[in-house]
Design a protein with these regions (language model features):
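Adenosine-nucleotide cofactor-binding segment
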Residues: 174-183, 193-253
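NAD(P)H dinucleotide-binding glycine-rich loop of Rossmann-like/cofactor-binding domains
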Residues: 96-181
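Glycine-rich beta-strand-centered segment in the early N-terminal region that forms part
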Residues: 25-41, 54-101, 143-148
Length: 303
């Protein structure tokens, strides 16, 4: 293919998830695209799930990574949003609907950053950010502030927006009691974002060794969960909870910590995308239960 972009990367070659050096070619830069030289790509738990086939059969070789920060080195002739030399970030989407008013992630034409069928790509699928370069539709890249390093910006492109979007939609206000369940990559972002909105944050973790760090993020209280049933002691404490736990667990005790008619948002993605719910557990709490997937481009730039 003419004008393809020679790229070095780390790719998974099978469901072991082990990544190894690999060289491949990306599609050419088209009129609405930009080419980014990648300076930092952070690791998301999604990378592990997908490369190990936890979310379904994969095509290999596959380059993971959807938390990407770098410098624009080429722009298509129609691009006005970016110029060569700009700092840019790419998250979980690289192409698709450009008129979806902040809901691009829910459009059926959306091309996610790696592992998705794409006839324009020489490898037949999109390839992610554990690589030297990436070609992306300009709409699906964001400007990065000059004062933020590539390393610090990269995790915001998935972990950040995945928690920012539902917290903003929940209209968190000063003094609201917000719970964050699961304090990993997403959870620590959720704590910081909720604190920045003036919320009283209650963090729920199974890892006692994280308590000091979580308090440092600004959480009012850290609850170490040894037995989920102990959570009923905190029933009705919260106005809102965001849950980032990425595996099967007892959900009802966590939901019970939210006040009746409050909201519980699930952003964790367990193996097989499946969770087990107790209907009576939800009914007894009368909590509004919903889920959220990353965020749109407008709110990503806002974040």
């Amino acid at each position: 293919m003419n004008n393809t972009i020679k790229t070095k990367a780390y790719a998974a070659f099978d469901e072991s998830g082990e990544i190894k050096p690999w060289e491949f070619e990306r599609r050419p830069v088209e009129d609405d695209d930009i080419l980014i030289e990648i300076k930092a790509a952070s690791i998301c738990h999604s990378d592990i799930h997908q490369e190990k086939g936890h979310w379904g059969k994969q095509q290999y070789p596959q380059v993971p990574g959807h938390e990407i920060a770098g410098i624009v080195t080429q722009v298509g002739k129609n691009v006005t949003k970016f110029k060569v030399g700009d700092k840019a970030g790419v998250g979980c989407m690289v192409n698709g609907c450009t008129t979806c008013e902040n809901e691009e992630q829910y459009h059926p034409d959306t091309k996610f950053t790696y592992g998705y069928a794409e006839e324009k790509e020489p490898t037949g699928i999109t390839q992610g950010g554990y690589s030297t370069h990436i070609v992306v539709r300009d709409h699906f890249a964001v400007h990065l502030p000059d004062g933020v390093s590539f390393e610090k910006a990269a995790p915001l492109l998935c972990a950040g927006i995945t928690t920012y979007s539902p917290l903003i939609k929940a209209d968190i206000k000063k003094g609201d009691k917000v719970g964050v369940a699961g304090i990993g990559g997403l959870g620590h972002m959720a704590v910081k974002i909720a604190v920045s909105k003036g919320a009283e944050v209650y963090a729920f973790t199974t890892s006692a060794d994280k308590v000091k760090d979580i308090k440092g993020f600004g959480a009012k209280e850290v609850i170490v969960v040894e037995d989920p049933k102990d959570l009923y002691a905190h029933a009705g404490l919260l106005d809102y909870m965001i849950c980032t736990i990425p595996y099967q667990f007892e959900i009802a005790p966590y939901v019970a910590t939210v006040k009746p008619n409050g909201f519980f948002t699930f952003v964790g993605m367990p193996v097989g995308f499946e969770v087990t719910l107790s209907n009576i557990g939800l009914a007894a709490s009368r909590v509004n239960f919903n889920a959220s997937l990353i965020g749109g481009m407008k709110e990503t730039q806002e974040m």
